[in-house]
Amino acid sequence: PVWSFLYRKMIHKLVAKGYRCIAPDLMGMGKSDKPISIKYHIYDTHCDNILTFIKKLKLKKITLFCQDWGSLIGLRIAGENSNLFSGIIAANAEIPNFTEESNPLYIPEPLKINTKIKSFKKAMAYHMLNNNGFNMDIFQVWVTYCITTPFVHISEIMGLSLSRNFKKDQKILDAYTAPFPSFIYMAGPRTLPSMNAGITGQTLKAIDGLKKFKKPFLSLIGLQDKLLGTPRIQNRFIKMVPGAKGQDHEQFKEANHFIQEDIGEIMAERMHKFIVKNKI
């Protein structure tokens, strides 16, 4: 449920080193337009939007830093359009290889708002971030919470998705809720998790492309993130992507799901080091 505010620590450091940094907000998020219909928010639409954005700005030689939905969208685009990219950093990232037959996720039917939901934590979706490993049943709880809650508790979600060592600043947490003045504008954060249920083979071409991606590829994970920050997912990328060979992959004990908020300055330093090392 985040927006480009998440990247402020990284952008500050990288711009100071002379880089051009672009952090687009997905439609329905941040400062972008917010279609109020949940039917607008499907995986293909968001991928098409970002690819159009890249082409409109005529971006080339991109060094991609992607995390969470930034990776489900970004890695698909990079896998299908490798000519636009010079390198990739995948941090707490994933691109699922679901087919119509293998995707276990679903949107609850009939779809109704559950007025009994009073908080993210009480809805038990927090288990998604604190269980002992990736579990599709737990992720389904997250999907159901977002699509049926009468209010997406974004600042609470952020607080539970940051490092145990992170000094929680309520003003910072509230900044993630700020783009959504009322429930009607929350169609984006409500539907992003359930968009996974609509992935039925669209990523397979991109995965094939990533298997042939020989340009530099770096994997960084926050070990407190039990969903995407797992060595299993990191090793999958290292084995799958040819360009991952010889790179300085790292695991950070002090970081959780939103690694850009927890250790954004370190992420910027690693990105700079990656670019310099590989002469991108």
Residue ranges and their predicted role:
Residues 244-280:
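Catalytic active-site module of serine/aspartate enzymes centered on a nucleophile-bearing elbow/loop
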Residues 1-31, 53:
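Conserved HGGG/HGGXW glycine-rich cap/lid loop of the alpha/beta-hydrolase fold
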Residues 26, 93, 254:
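Active-site loop/turn elements of alpha/beta-hydrolase fold enzymes
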